[in-house]
Regions:
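ATP-dependent helicase/translocase motor core
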Residues: 1-66, 70-172
Length: 172
């Protein structure tokens, strides 16, 4: 019986590659929250954190979308609510659920759910994000793509976005 990992490896990744995503842009099995601490008596344990099957990055520091993959025999939409929840936590605008055959997209900018034949290209997704976030000025869009300064550990002061280790934070 196939597993979710089989679906990811044999069905989802080839579709991402076909859409032009590269290994550098595809982050697999990303834990983006620490697990909840549960106290029982005098002992405290940490549960597992939330883990996205895939995060799609436009650049190293700019995550555009989350994908929740389900095993092949489930419906493509079975993981959509989970993907939407993850996208909201991460401040992302695009959530996808797939069983490797069908793909369901939820656009958090428009609130629309769409069934797709394939994943959008990185450029198409970035273009849609720019349009949805009203980033018409190329200079402003470039500032959003400016990476964290790893030497100083600071974000450039003229950058309009905040950075978190797992993905993009919501604008403040």
């Amino acid at each position: 019986m196939p597993t979710e990992a089989d679906t990811c490896r044999t069905l989802v990744l080839p579709k991402l590659y076909a859409a032009g995503w590269t290994d550098e842009q595809i982050a697999e099995q990303c834990t983006f929250t620490a697990g909840r601490i549960v106290v029982q008596g005098t002992k405290a344990t940490r549960r597992k954190g939330k883990r996205a099957d895939y995060l799609l990055r436009y650049t190293r520091d700019k995550v555009l979308a989350v994908i929740e993959a389900k095993v092949e025999y489930k419906k493509p939409a079975d993981g959509l609510q989970q993907a939407i929840d993850y996208a909201q936590i991460l401040g992302l605008k695009f959530a996808y659920s797939t069983n490797g055959h069908g793909i369901i997209e939820f656009d958090l900018i428009t609130g629309k759910e769409t069934e797709l034949d394939g994943f959008p290209t990185p450029a198409a997704l970035w273009s849609r994000l720019r349009a949805g976030e009203n980033l018409k000025d190329d200079a402003q869009a470039e500032r959003i793509l400016t990476p964290l300064n790893l030497t100083t550990g600071k974000i450039p002061m003229n950058s309009p976005r905040a950075w978190t280790g797992g993905a993009n934070a919501k604008k403040t």
